[in-house]
Amino acid sequence: NIPVIALTATATQKVQSDIVKYLGLRNPNIFISSFNRSNLYYEVQPKQKKDQVVKTIVKFISQNKGKSGIIYTLNRKTTEELAQMLVANGIKAVAYHAGLDSKLRTLRQDQFLGEEVQVIVATIAFGMGIDKPDVRFVIHYNMPKSIENYYQETGRAGRDGLEGKCILF
């Protein structure tokens, strides 16, 4: 009879059932709150040619100078290329993905958290356990793998209760 608490930001009905089953919970109290975060603003942009999407992203970031943001991509190559294009346009950005050695990943994460860089361009390898309350925007360069991933990743914006912008290409 050891008390157990299980917490998650997002869980489908199946995941909730699995948690109850695998933790051996009997008649658990389950509390669910709304997915709605009134401080987050969602926008969908049509996917155009790569150079046009990059121009749109650069323009948006330039209009949000000094504000931290995360750009999610689906693969390492795109992450590296996009970070390089942002740097070439005068934006302090770094790439983050599982292919980097752990020391470099830690350094880049610390640079982002310490505001040495404005933007981190990342695969889904970035984010779990990251709590930077003042992320003002999350951009998805590619469609996320699932709606749950999208919600989880956009939820990194505006954790301080202030406005966050979520843009999907």
Model-derived segments and spans:
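Helicase motor core with emphasis on the C-terminal RecA-like subdomain
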Residues: 1-169
